[in-house]
Amino acid sequence: MSPVEESPEEFLARFAAHRVEVRLYPEPWGSPLLEVQTPAGFVYAMDRGAPPAPVGEARVLFHGLARKVARAQGKEGVFREGAAYRLVGTARPLEKGFYLLLARGLPVVVHWEGPMPEEGEVLLWPPLMLFRE
């Protein structure tokens, strides 16, 4: 299996077309976890950018590693389950091993080695990751 990313900068450049406008909220200095207001509501994501994280409007890329993938059973959305997120939405392939899952207006680049249904339900491994410039 090849690495999922070469570097945060390379990953962001590779999938930059799938960034989304969000609002970042202040976190304690040095905290890697960001509180983010997205089109789908608030999420917590691990910041893959250099400190300090900006506050306010930003264009960011969300990325997650899929633990389980199934055909969508519930309503579309982004649901927190402990430290993990369950995404339910529309998926489309980007390149080998990567899909774009759109859940209530929130695009997330998901890594999954197998096939993903067009209407998918994905349980991510924690953490949900956020890439920014």
Tell me what each language-model feature is.
Residues 63-66, 75-78, 127-132:
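Noncatalytic linker/hinge segments flanking ATPase motor cores
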Residues 68-117:
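Short, solvent-exposed interaction modules
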Residues 25-43, 93-109:
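OB-fold (S1/OB) nucleic-acid-binding surfaces
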Residues 1-2, 13-15, 38-40, 70, ...:
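A short linear-motif detector with a strong N-terminal bias
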Residues 28-74:
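Acidic (E/D-rich), amphipathic helical modules within compact regulatory domains
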Residues 107-133:
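Mixed-charge, glycine-accented linear interaction segment located at domain edges/termini
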Residues 2-28, 76-97, 122-124:
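Structural detector for short beta-strands of small beta-barrel domains
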